[in-house]
Amino acid sequence: MTHINSALEDADPNIASLIQEESKRQENHLELIASENFTSKAVMEAQGSVLTNKYAEGLPNKRYYGGCEHIDKIEGLAIERAKQLFKAEWANVQPHSGAQANFSVFLSLLEPGEKIMGMDLSHGGHLTHGSPVNVSGKWFKAIHYGVDKETQRLEMENVREIALKNRPKLIICGYSAYPRNIDFLAFRSIADEVGAYLLADMAHIAGLVATGIHPSPIPHCDVVTTTTHKTLRGPRGGLILCRNAEFGKRFDKAVFPGSQGGPLEHVIAAKAVAFGEALKPGFSSYCEQLVKNSKALAKRMQDRGIAVVSNGTDNHIVLLDLRSIDMTGKEADSLVSAINVTTNKNTVPFDPKSPFVTSGLRLGTAALTTRGFDEPAFLEVADLIADRLLNPTDLILKNKCQQRVLDLCNRFPLYD
């Protein structure tokens, strides 16, 4: 029994040491991966609590296990806060991830072999929106739409034509590398015209939707899924929302027992904490600054001669088109990684390179904005990235860029 009272550094010094090393990496690197953010200590405290010990299959007050009286209250708070935050009538907070949330929707609304329609992965879509390597592309007949070749933005008339030609059962809007606002009302009109369900996957923009900076999909879509991290700043997890409570109930059974067993109640508690944080006024200020930072970053990259997909951004994503400097995403990712800037290579629309090489580099402002970075700081970030990419063989400049990164990290510390 004594093992349960041992501190991690005593029970498993190897893991404790690696966690400490990762903590140092996060503190001393510039985190620009668009799907990552930093949670509060309160969120981490909830997730690392005794709630991890409890099994709670079912829904609040409808459990298959006893001893859930406190769990029910915690999950109930998470549900009510999610509904309040997004102005939804129904919510399920149990999905372990955004992918699980999407799969639960498919399980509820579709039969194998039916048609789904989502954005092409290389244009900014997501694996779970019909990619052939994902179950969504294996079980369903996937049709894809993309952006205009010139503007690199969605042209809704083109989306409409593809929908009319293919008559999908489900249309998906919401993306992983699309830096512009989404016209949910236009998607609703198209879905109605072809008799399709409409799913919005707002995983990347949930924080912006919650604060009204991005238009909400809730009034226009049959169902909405999201992750709870990214711009929402919560723990890694998923969430399903509906404007209609009766319609939403069908997804409860799709989550459990349809696609999951016991919910992760320690993560659900952390979600509740994050939703509570997002309901406070300071979160709106954070999201407003996040977008300002993105626009500043995009403009400075363009000023330095590096093209930006769609010629700018409306959200936290800045997607660089490195064909403008004759460089691949793989090369660029390696170059900035060497100065402790964390990004990811990414395809750009109509990319001639493979997904393992790519012509793009995806940047995101969510994590550094959490650290307190403002527009002047992001101009510094843009300049050191541009300096590195435009002078890849200059080792003296590389060392200077490394020091500039460390100076920025010291000016904007992560955790006390």
Swiss-Prot record:
Q: Could you confirm whether the keyword Transferase appears in this record? A: yes
Q: Which cofactor does it need?
A: pyridoxal 5'-phosphate
Residues bound to (6S)-5,6,7,8-tetrahydrofolate are: L121, G125, H126, L127, S354, P355, F356
Q: What is the lineage of its organism?
A: Bacteria, Bacillati, Cyanobacteriota, Cyanophyceae, Synechococcales
Q: Which reaction does it catalyse?
A: (6R)-5,10-methylene-5,6,7,8-tetrahydrofolate + glycine + H2O = (6S)-5,6,7,8-tetrahydrofolate + L-serine
SUPFAM superfamilies membership: PLP-dependent transferases
Q: What is its EC number?
A: 2.1.2.1
Gene Ontology BP annotations: glycine biosynthetic process from serine; tetrahydrofolate interconversion
How it assembles, according to the record, is: Homodimer.
Sum up the protein's function in the record's words.
Catalyzes the reversible interconversion of serine and glycine with tetrahydrofolate (THF) serving as the one-carbon carrier. This reaction serves as the major source of one-carbon groups required for the biosynthesis of purines, thymidylate, methionine, and other important biomolecules. Also exhibits THF-independent aldolase activity toward beta-hydroxyamino acids, producing glycine and aldehydes, via a retro-aldol mechanism.
**Residues bearing N6-(pyridoxal phosphate)lysine?**
K230
Domain of life per record: Bacteria
This chain belongs to the protein called Serine hydroxymethyltransferase
User: What pathway, per the record?
Assistant: One-carbon metabolism; tetrahydrofolate interconversion; Amino-acid biosynthesis; glycine biosynthesis; glycine from L-serine: step 1/1
Q: Which HAMAP family match?
A: SHMT (MF_00051)
Query: Tell me, what is one Gene Ontology molecular-function annotation carried by this entry?
Result: glycine hydroxymethyltransferase activity
One Gene Ontology cellular component annotation?
cytosol
**Positions bearing the site annotation: Plays an important role in substrate specificity:** H229
Asked if the keyword Plastid belongs to this entry, the reply reads: no
* Principal place of residence: cytoplasm
